[in-house]
Amino acid sequence: MTFEELYRTMLKQAVERGSVQADDLEASAGHLDCLLHPQDHPLVWPLNPCPCPKEETHCAAACLFDAIVRRDDGTLAVDPDRCSGCGACIQACQSGNLTASRDVLPALDAVKHAKGPVYALIAPAFLGQFSTVVTPGRLRSAFKLLGFTGMVEVALFADLLTLKEALEFDRNIHTETDFQLTSCCCPMWIGMIRKLYHELMPHVPGAVSPMIAAGRTVKKLHPDAVTIFVGPCIAKKAEAREWVSALYTGGDVIRERRD
């Protein structure tokens, strides 16, 4: 059973039966653990030993953060502290041996066992990912059929934070030597500055991202709510994990979900 076949089988079980029967599946123990406990693994998963010649490890060469190390036996190790979730290694891999973490199974489990309301925080990118037939209303209805209480569009908080950054820019920039690195929306941008150009961090506004702001707002209105972020960006998972590890008290575990 390939990894994709395993993933689809487990997803079907979770939807139809309400749980995954892992003991009935003949698959790699490593693959099973990644799908059942993605939070315990890096954002990028090597599925098998790398088939490329050692001097042509394209994924490692594409990583700006030196997060990928190739062992002598050909297996790859991804450093979760260095990986920012940019996805460059996945695009560079010519054998299709790398995949982004899949978090749908834990998301469905969180919806099923939630003791309070469950809200989907939807990234603005959904407007360009589906056909024009998929309206916000239809998407909200689909989430409700899956067990969600409702849907919140994160675009609203992006607008609010853009205004906040504009006000900060107006307050902080007075001379030709003053500058501010904007865009709190992008965790990849912030991660790059923090890890490669850390001396510039004082020039980054202190605003949280729209995803975090949306989660905080929902938790303010419904303290017992579960919030699940839905979007196409792998780096949002790194951001969510950072907030969780920092004991983020403004909201529940916010995970990025990819179809």
Model segments located where?
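Immediate flanking context of iron-sulfur cluster ligation sites
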Residues: 42-46, 76-83, 221-230
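Short amphipathic alpha-helical segments, especially helix-boundary/capping motifs
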Residues: 36-37, 66, 80-84, 115-120, ...
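Ferredoxin-type iron-sulfur electron-transfer modules and their immediate structural context
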Residues: 1-62, 66
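Iron-sulfur-associated redox domains of electron-transfer enzymes in respiratory
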Residues: 2-14, 28, 101-259
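Residue-level detector of short coil/turn "hinge" positions at structural boundaries
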Residues: 21, 32, 37, 41, ...
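A diffuse structural propensity rather than consistent per-protein peaks
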Residues: 21, 79, 255-259
